[in-house]
């Protein structure tokens, strides 16, 4: 069942608009979580809804999230800041601050750990850790009456795309749409969305009808690590199951419906100053995590998302008229190793549990005769050496950890904090960057670990799948880094540009479309002149 209010279902498309010489009054920035270039390429020829329409804009099908830590928070932090994580401070979804006083040393990217009693899992949502302005922040500096509205399926997506001063920010908190803005007056559209979603979740969901394109992919695949088989699901859901609601096409429909309601209620795009709407569509990521990218489940998700995007654009045609859309993704993703192995991917495997920081730390403690937590982190990415050690002991632990990780057959590279600090921010196109250059753009000396571990290509860093996640992202490899970028505005010609541009290029490009001043030296991206209406100034 599609979750679209009557007001959206009645929104018919208007005739194609002529090319406008004036800047648009509404910028719509959409992130489709985990929409890799690979998935985009696979489905683009068969999609005839929203993606087909946006595809008649300027399409960069193989753009990049240049950094190594290809996770949701870092990815969203680049889209509307124009800055790498090394500049904006969002190096991962979670990092560690071993000097903080609370017992939980982990730090969630979109929390304010200064709040008493908070933890990295029971946190106060905040943009506290984002070090740079977003597009919405820049808009308010130049046009104080400009409004920024954010809607997303994840709090970190909403926060990182809307920045410090949004007028409305709403995200799914696991139960309903919530906000972190103090003393916020809840719009009627949010009240309606909450009621509609609660009623939707309370009803069971029968399996979706599967067209031939998707049913051809419906092969059951056993999953290692204790998880349930995947591949032939059709999003059957019991009444009240909000977890499966989130990992289904229903979720993006609800997010877009709320976004449309706020556009109408707030009359976005109808004032003198340009407005910004950011939309974080998270279902593709949850579907990829639970089922992988090559089964019937992802096929049904992509077809549904295409249809819902088409409805949303038709609504904007009627409600706003002249607007511009930029669509991209926070990161890519890959399929489950079991299905990849069957397809002939020789190196596809699940990570060795011995690589987790906790397990490795215990092994090193036994070897070195040291007690306590020696290592903090996951089974890849930033690893931190415990602080409760004498300098000589810490040096021994670091040396032993580096040797152990580097010797492991699933590890491609290990770079120390010192190595990364000495490495220059890369120039040139991101498809040519070395691994250490990719890691450098994810490095912040005040937040990064003592060293970073990069796994070999096609290693899936999930060993235990009993919790429901069977696949993930986060690597420095191109299947996780490559994403599409689409710029669209009514009346401009279609253009596909197969160049390795980056998501950090979006901010300066949009700024060039609307005449927005961006301080020199404050960003890492560059203006993309093929984008519709972008007047790029070369210095």
Q: Which residues does each predicted region cover?
A:
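Short, solvent-exposed turn/loop segments enriched in Gly/Ser/Thr/Pro and often Arg
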Residues: 60-80, 150-160, 280-282, 324, ...
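Short, structured active-site-proximal loop/turn typified by the sulfatase FGly-forming signature C/S-X-P-X-R
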Residues: 41-88, 145-151
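Substrate-binding rim/cap in mid-to-C-terminal beta-strand-loop elements of soluble/periplasmic
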Residues: 342, 346, 350-395, 470-514, ...
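His/Asp/Glu-rich, glycine-adjacent segments
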Residues: 84, 90-273, 282-289, 407-409, ...
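Non-catalytic, well-ordered alpha-helical segments in soluble enzyme domains
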Residues: 37, 52-53, 132-141, 380-415, ...
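N-terminal signal peptide c-region/cleavage motif recognized by signal peptidases
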Residues: 13-16
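Beta-strand elements within well-structured catalytic alpha/beta cores of enzymes
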Residues: 24-36, 53-54, 79, 139, ...
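Secreted, luminal/periplasmic, and some membrane-associated catalytic domains
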Residues: 62, 69, 93-124, 164, ...
